[in-house]
Amino acid sequence: MSKRENIKTTIEEIVAYWSEHEDESGLSVDFSEAHERCWRCGYKRKLERCHIVPASRGGEVKPSNFVLLCKKCHKENPNITDSKIMWDWLRAYAVPFYNTFRINMGIIEYEKIYGITVQEECAKRKINDYEELRSIMKEKTKELSYHFGEGCFNSSTIAGWIRITLEEYDKRHNLKTDKNIEPLVSRKRVI
């Protein structure tokens, strides 16, 4: 098996190409910062040149066949020969504000695990004072940890952080935290 050639296409060439050929509306990044922020999560990270059409499937080494992703997002990107799928994926995960992607993924993960949205959890408790929740979340941060080699909390850690925050809120207000956990595949709205 031959070793793949080093990619000669630069980050600047990729940004220049896509800033003229793709609308940044609905993406997690503005093209003015696309050279330093991941195009999926929007965080400032070391960027990797990610093939749109995989090299293993004949993807070319030219600006039109690359997007810029952080290592974590690069591992999760679609590896398929239809280039539209990459742009569908990027737009589906777009967030309107920088540095909110991971918390949003944690909120989605929370619903998957507990079968209820965070918004519904707050409404059920009639929470109007979010400062108290923020304060509890800050206290609970000491109970969290990154996986070795990762620089951020994963979505299940964030979902757990939300859960222990709500449990503490319930404890302080003499409320009972629901413990109904069903397998995701048995819920009606899945598949």
Regions found by a protein language model. Name each.
Residues 135-191:
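C-terminal, charged low-complexity interaction regions
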Residues 1-37, 59:
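Short, charged surface segments at domain edges that flank catalytic/cofactor-binding sites
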Residues 48-52:
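Histidine-centered catalytic micro-motifs used for acid/base chemistry in nuclease
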Residues 53-61, 84-94:
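Short cysteine/histidine-rich metal-coordination sites, predominantly Zn2+-binding motifs
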Residues 59-77:
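Short beta-strand-alpha-helix junction that forms the catalytic/metal-binding core
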Residues 38-41, 70:
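Short cysteine-rich clusters marking metal-coordination/redox-active sites
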Residues 42-46, 77:
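Cys/His-rich microdomains that often coordinate metals
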Residues 94-127:
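PEST-like low-complexity intrinsically disordered regions enriched in Ser/Thr/Pro and acidic residues
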